[in-house]
C-alpha cells in the first residue's frame, strides 16, 4: 500500500483527465467582499446615518425616532411597507402595530419566521396622524430605499401596499388591479 496525501491524489486525478486546474487546499472565499456580514452592517449603519441626517423634513420633525429596519440582514427575502405608524414610532421597528400582527400571522401560515426575513419601509419617519406619505415624501426617501435594497440584495422583494407600490412603479397604477401580479423592478442596474 502506498499512502498519498489528498494533494497528490488530486494532482494525479487532474493530470489523468488533462485538466489545467491547480489544486490548492486554501479556503475558498465564497462571498464577495461586499457580501461579508461586517461590510453589510457598516453599509447599513452609514445609510441609517444618512437618513438621520436629512434636514428640512416634516416627517422627521413630527416623529419620535427613525424607524430603519427589522429582521435578518442576510435574508434573501426583503419586505417593504408604507411607513411607520404610532407603535412603530414608539418602538423603532417596522410592522409592530396591527399591521405587524397581521404580517406575523401571514408569515406563520407559510411557516416563515419573522426573524428570518428583512423588513423596512418606504419612508423611515412616521407621517403625522398616521396619514399616507405624500408623493413628494415617497420621492424624497426612494433613493434611500433603493440603496437599502441594493445593500441587502434580496432574491425576493415583497412590496406591501399602495405606498410601497408607488415607490417602485409610480402612482399611475391602482393596487387593486396590480395585486398578485409579479413584476420585475430594476434598482441600480439589478433586476428584482
Residue ranges and their predicted role:
Residues 3, 8-192:
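A polyanion-binding, active-site-adjacent surface
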Amino acid at each position: 500500500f502506498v499512502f498519498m496525501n489528498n494533494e497528490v491524489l488530486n494532482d494525479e486525478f487532474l493530470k489523468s483527465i488533462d485538466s489545467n486546474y491547480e489544486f490548492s487546499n486554501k479556503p475558498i472565499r465564497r462571498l464577495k467582499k461586499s457580501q461579508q456580514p461586517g461590510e453589510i452592517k457598516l453599509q447599513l449603519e452609514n445609510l441609517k446615518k444618512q437618513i438621520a441626517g436629512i434636514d428640512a423634513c416634516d416627517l422627521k420633525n413630527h416623529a419620535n425616532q427613525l424607524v430603519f429596519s427589522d429582521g435578518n440582514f442576510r435574508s434573501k427575502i426583503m419586505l417593504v411597507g408604507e411607513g411607520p405608524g404610532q407603535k412603530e414610532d414608539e418602538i423603532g421597528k417596522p410592522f409592530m402595530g396591527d399591521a405587524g400582527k397581521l404580517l406575523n400571522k401571514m408569515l406563520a401560515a407559510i411557516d416563515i419566521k419573522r426573524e428570518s426575513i428583512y423588513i423596512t419601509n418606504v419612508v423611515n419617519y412616521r407621517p403625522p396622524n398616521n396619514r399616507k406619505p405624500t408623493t413628494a415624501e415617497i420621492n424624497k426617501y426612494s433613493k434611500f430605499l433603493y440603496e437599502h435594497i441594493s445593500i441587502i440584495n434580496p432574491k425576493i422583494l415583497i412590496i406591501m401596499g399602495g405606498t410601497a407600490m408607488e415607490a417602485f412603479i409610480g402612482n399611475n397604477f391602482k393596487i387593486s388591479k396590480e395585486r398578485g401580479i409579479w413584476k420585475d423592478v430594476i434598482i441600480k442596474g439589478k433586476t428584482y
